[in-house]
Amino acid sequence: MKKINPTQTSAWKALQQHFKEIEPIHIRHLFHADPKRSEKFSLTFNDLIRVDFSKNRLTAQTIEKLQALAQETDLALAICSMFSGGKINETEERPVLHIALRNRGNQPILVDGQDVMPLVNAVLEKMKRFCHQVIKGDWNGYSGQTITDVVNIGIGGSDLGPYMATEALKPYKNHLKMHFVSNVDGTDIVETLKALNPARTLFIVASKTFTTQETMTNAQTAREWFLKTAGDSAHVARHFVALSTNIKEVTNFGIDPENSFEFWDWVGGRYSLWSAIGLPIALSIGFDNFEKLLEGAYEMDQHFLKTDFTHNIPVILALIGIWYSHFFGAETEAVLPYDQYLHRFPAYLQQASMESNGKWVDRDGKPVGYQTGSILWGEPGTNGQHAFYQLIHQGTKIIPCDFIAPVISHNAIGDHHHKLLANFFAQTQALAFGKTEQEVQEELMAEGVFSEKATYLAPFKAFSGNRPTNSILLKQITPLSLGALIALYEHKIFTQGVILNIFSFDQWGVELGKKLASGILSELEGPEKVSCHDSSTNSLINCFKKWH
């Protein structure tokens, strides 16, 4: 990928000038000036997803100038490089090929001259056979009983993606009960194991190296718990499978190498749910539905690869994000799913975005002089409305929001879904258009409030509006549409990283704390006071040793 400082481009300078013209304009005015604004600023993907970005502080000219920035930073070349297996993860000298994992067209994708698709397809076929065995009851535990519960032990991308997707696709789940353990805090695994029967529980240990501290600590605890009942360590092979490439350590643990599912170093953890890491998803919803998840992502991949930037949904959403973070000074963005099944979607995107683009040096290794990754957060609606929407509506910070909702609910009970979606539509309208003090005064007086009190209350009850949102409607949450939605955000994140001249596919920021923790671990044993760190860390460690 080229190494272009976006702030030095002519497109960036044009956007700076354009911002001065746009900044004072209210969204209310933009709609009044163009009755067809929504039609012009909406895109539909495969009759599955509709994205309305009309309630933003931008014009057609803004989009044109943002697209010029994408062109000047050579986004098109970067996209082609990723899809063709170029080693765009330069600091680790690796390609970035999560797109190969869902390459349903089976086009050859080369890494160092070798087509990776036969490897990908072989692992998928192995996953398919295993899932059918477990789901149909042909895979029995040591006592001859079938499996009823599956515990996924992983962390980061080995947990967030599978957990999010199994929750989102609960309407498609079978009889298997899914559990996820990630935190090294013993409470996590202890509470999970309390209600489980060792003879009917299958553990998935997800660690590429099979050395990840948190994952292997939890896996060893699970193994000890299992053997208290099973007794014979040979039984581990029927109750533990691995998602790993370290066959030696997998075998040492007691797992049959035949029950280890491979993935590759060109798959980043936060982009790995499409790989063997997605085994818990496939076990939960069945392999046919897992393939539909891959199909939805593949269709979005093709849209991203082949669609002109003017109609390219991931590119447009990425550019809008840059518009707010780098010109309006927005520091956070909220993802607000109006569907309880998507309750873990913001947490999943939080890792995908912040671990990818939370970088302080550019692709030349020099400190950037501009913002990179935004802080991403969110909660399901309508819960959030009774928690933090106050600040979004009337606070002093600009917080761009993505509102996400399905048109068709999987649980059409009474008028629940109509009330939910009424709130969805109302919130984006209120954020965009607000309510003036004059409108508040007139309403209050119409309700019988005296003029003096109405004047007093008006500033507190007024809404400035002009708060930006994107509305993303899914026809329904299905494996196909969820796959497309996840891939949409993946490509949005990639696009922003390209334009901002940073590497989105490494994560060196997680290493220092892990290394320090490894050294501190041995210091927590014994009565000796610790004095080898800074005064604060020494004091905290010594307090722990005193109270423990």
UniProtKB/Swiss-Prot annotation:
The active site is at 355 (proton donor), 386, 514. It is found in: Cytoplasm. GO terms for biological process: gluconeogenesis; glucose 6-phosphate metabolic process; glycolytic process. Disulfide bonds: none annotated. PROSITE patterns: P_GLUCOSE_ISOMERASE_1, P_GLUCOSE_ISOMERASE_2, P_GLUCOSE_ISOMERASE_3. Pathway: Carbohydrate biosynthesis; gluconeogenesis; Carbohydrate degradation; glycolysis; D-glyceraldehyde 3-phosphate and glycerone phosphate from D-glucose: step 2/4. It comes from the Bacteria. The keyword Disulfide bond does not apply. One of its GO terms (cellular component) is cytosol. Its EC number is 5.3.1.9. Keywords: Cytoplasm, Gluconeogenesis, Glycolysis, Isomerase. InterPro entries: G6P_Isomerase, G6P_Isomerase_C, Phosphoglucose_isomerase_CS, SIS_dom_sf, SIS_PGI_1, SIS_PGI_2. The keyword Cytoplasm applies. It is an enzyme of class 5 (isomerase). Transmembrane segments: none annotated. GO terms for molecular function: carbohydrate derivative binding; glucose-6-phosphate isomerase activity; monosaccharide binding. Pfam families: PGI. It catalyses: alpha-D-glucose 6-phosphate = beta-D-fructose 6-phosphate. PANTHER family: GLUCOSE-6-PHOSPHATE ISOMERASE (PTHR11469:SF1). Catalyzes the reversible isomerization of glucose-6-phosphate to fructose-6-phosphate. Belongs to the GPI family. This is Glucose-6-phosphate isomerase. The lineage of its organism: Bacteria, Pseudomonadati, Pseudomonadota, Gammaproteobacteria, Enterobacterales. The gene is pgi.
